Curated annotation (Swiss-Prot):
It comes from the Bacteria. This is Chaperone protein DnaJ. Zn(2+) 1 binds at C152, C155, C209, C212. Its cofactor is Zn(2+). Keywords: Chaperone, Cytoplasm, DNA replication, Metal-binding, Repeat, Stress response, Zinc, Zinc-finger. GO terms for molecular function: ATP binding; heat shock protein binding; unfolded protein binding; zinc ion binding. Participates actively in the response to hyperosmotic and heat shock by preventing the aggregation of stress-denatured proteins and by disaggregating proteins, also in an autonomous, DnaK-independent fashion. Unfolded proteins bind initially to DnaJ; upon interaction with the DnaJ-bound protein, DnaK hydrolyzes its bound ATP, resulting in the formation of a stable complex. GrpE releases ADP from DnaK; ATP binding to DnaK triggers the release of the substrate protein, thus completing the reaction cycle. Binds 2 Zn(2+) ions per monomer. InterPro entries: DnaJ, DnaJ_C, DnaJ_domain, DnaJ_domain_CS, HSP40/DnaJ_pept-bd, HSP_DnaJ_Cys-rich_dom, HSP_DnaJ_Cys-rich_dom_sf, J_dom_sf. The gene is dnaJ.
Amino acid sequence: MDRLAKRDYYEILGVPRNATEAEIKKAFRNLARKYHPDANKDDPDAAEKFKEINEAYQVLSDPEKRARYDQFGHAAEQMGGAGGNPFEGFGGFGDFGGFSDIFEMFFGGAGRQRNPRGPVRGADLEYELELTLKEAAFGCTKELRVPRVEDCDTCHGSGARPGTQPVTCPKCGGTGQVQMTQHTVFGRFVNVMTCDRCRGEGKIVESPCPTCRGRGRVQKTQRVEVKVPGGVETGTRLRMPGYGEAGERGGPPGDLFIVMRVRPDRRFRREGDDLFTTTEISFIQAALGTEIEVETLDGPELIKIPEGTQPGDTIRLKGKGTHRLRGSGRGDLHVVISVKTPGRLSERERELLLEVAALRGERVAGMTENKEKSFLKKMKDALGGR
C-alpha cells in the first residue's frame, strides 16, 4: 500500500492536522533550513529528506490541495490531478448505463490515472547571498558555488552498476502502480496507488551503481555567476530559471532563488533608498558654522555646517543614497548633526565662556556676582564710561 511508501504530510512537517497556515509555513522553514543539502554536505540522505519536506509543504500550503489530501490522503494525487471533486462537471447520468458504468469510469482501472513514471520537474533551490551595503547599493557580480542534485555520470541516471540494467518490478509488473480494492455501500472501489516496491518507477535496481548507491542521482557543486542589481536589500529574491536541481526522467530543471542578506554597516543606516549617518561637531563649530568632511558611499565629501546648527539637525546630500531597484536615480544621504560639549576647559577657556554668558545675560555655574560686576565694569570702561 502507498502508506508504506509515503509518510503522512502532517507527520513530515511535525504539525497537527488542524495547524494554521502560519504554523505550517514556520515548520517548513525550520525543517528546510535544517535539512538543506548545502548545510548537510556529508549526509547523502539530506537531499531526499529536503525533497520530502518540500513535497509536503506544496500540498499543505495550498488550501485546495490540502482539502483533497485531508479527504483522500495520498490517493488524492491519483484522483483528477490538480482538479477538485472527481464527479465535478457531470450534470446527470443520462449518458451512462447506470451506477456500475459511473463507478467503473472513476474507479475501475488505471488507464485514466496519470502516469507516475512521466517526466518530473527538478526541485527549486534557495541560496542566501551575503552582501556589504556598498555591494547592495551599487550592484555587483558574484560567483556562487551552489550544491545541486544531478544525474549520476557513472550510471547516467539509471542507478544500476555499469554493465547491468534495472529489472521490471515484480510487484507492479512494470506499471509503477498497484490497485487497492475497497468495498463500499456503492460497490467495489478500486483505487490506483503508486507501487511501494519501485516507488512508481516500474523498475528496481538489483545491482546498485557504486557511485550513487542506486539512486541514479548525485550531489554536485555548480558555479553560478550572479549579477546583483543595485538597490537590493535584505529579503530581495532573484530568480534564475533552470539553475535548480535536474529533473527526473527527462523533466526540466527547477529554478534557483537567490535571497539577499545585507550586512549591517557601522557608518550608515538604511531606510528604503535613503541612507542616514551621524557626524559630530563641537559646540563652537555649531554656533559659528564650519566646513567638515563626511563619509559617503562614493568617498569623503566636504559639507557646509551653517552657524547656529542645533543637535539633531540634518543636512541632506541628494543622490548619495543607494540606487533604486525599480526606477532610475539614487536616494539621498541624510547627515545628522551631533554636537559635542567639552568635558574639561582650561582656565582661559572658562573665562571666555563666562564672558560670553555674561554678554548674553545667562547665569551659569561658576559665575559670581562680583565677577559679573567686574566684567560689566570692564565693558563700560572699554566703551568710554558710558
